[in-house]
Amino acid sequence: MDWEEGAKNTVKSREVTLSQLQAKKNKKKSVHNRKGMSDYDRVLTAYNYLRSNCIYAYRGWQYNYANTAWGALVYGEAQCSGYARAMKALCDAIGVDCRYVHADSKASNPSHQWNQVRVGDKWCILDAQSGGFLLGSRTWKKKAGMSWDTKGLPTCNMTDYKK
């Protein structure tokens, strides 16, 4: 994959960057994705891994590619977009359905980004940057003040996931 000047949602490098990201994803998959784990346990493990190995990039998204999965997984520093992209990459690696979601203009923070993940047959909100784990859409809207365009996204449960 060649990087193009001004391209969105890409990592500013070529094979080296992609191979580093793939190595992180593969390490995460091989170390933490045990045979027979439930969707819940796989998502929880990926979530805990990201929360334990990445800090919020207060300097801004432009440092250490903090708005990319690479910034979160390789540099260990990200903003919400980097956390959400890293969570998507980890879920892809461990075989869990995951969507990347961006707040709309009516949200308390219109630039915020997070994920929707499927655990069993239920879709829930997951925000590794802020600490939201398997929340229902009602909780996410009420407590975090988030709203988003749901077109093209699976319908989330209204209530939080209970194991």
Task: Please tell me what each predicted stretch does.
Residues G6-T10:
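Long, amphipathic alpha-helical segments that form or neighbor coiled-coils/leucine zippers used
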Residues S13-A72:
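Secondary-structure boundary elements
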Residues Y63, A72-G76, S105-S108:
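A glycine-rich, coil/turn loop motif that links secondary-structure elements
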Residues G82-S147:
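Hydrophobic/aromatic-rich core segments of domains that either
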Residues W148-K162:
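Short, low-complexity, Pro/Ser/Thr/Gly-rich segments in the mature regions of secreted, periplasmic
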